[in-house]
Amino acid sequence: QLLPRYSTFTLMDLETGLTWNAQRRAGSFHADIQPLTNQDTLQLKTIYGGSWSWNRRAVVVLAGNRRIAASINGMPHGAGALKNGFPGHHCLHFWESTTHTKSRPDPAHQVMVHKAAGRLHTYLAELDPNDLQLAVLEMAGQGDTAIVRLGILNPPDGTNPGQLAAQIQNINIRDSQQGEVEDGRYTGRYNVSVYFHGDNSEYRKSITLTSRYQADLGRWLVEPDFLAQLLTR
């Protein structure tokens, strides 16, 4: 409703401050958008480091006198109608937006929406243990070690979350099995596919994440031992 179909608006990338113009083409539970011109496409690709990516990024939508916290991915897919050098469209998510195939909001997009709104720390602290694990795994797949660190207990010596960005290109969560909270502890099990930089192989893993409730902080944090599980080939 804020961005009617075929409306144009400006987006600002939170990390770089770079802006570009876009048009909403379709979408109902989230917006399918396209860069407006070839120059806008070039600006978007610059924001993504010169390569298209499914990674989510925090953005602010500037529409009239409104500033709306949002999240994008940077991968052209599907149909595109504008002559802009962008082969398809990409997705723009807001608070509680969902994808075409799932009824629940996308965890990675929601992390970035709240980052854009200046509520990242609060949002992570308010998540239940299952949703926190999903958010941490998604951010690990993006190599966003700064956000991963916000969701985990201090890693032991020899475990460096920074290795995620250096080694892992992507993590695909194929399915998950939720656990039960017992004595301030929650364990979730995930079947994931891990892809490493410079390696075309798919590494299928079954990993376990354990969250512990930190009474002094009033929130959940994930134990960091899952990092070693992800990084083992």
Predicted regions and their residues:
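Secreted/periplasmic proteins that engage bacterial cell-wall peptidoglycan
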Residues: 5, 10-35, 157-160
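Short conserved beta-strand and strand-loop elements enriched in small hydrophobics
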Residues: 8-13, 56-65
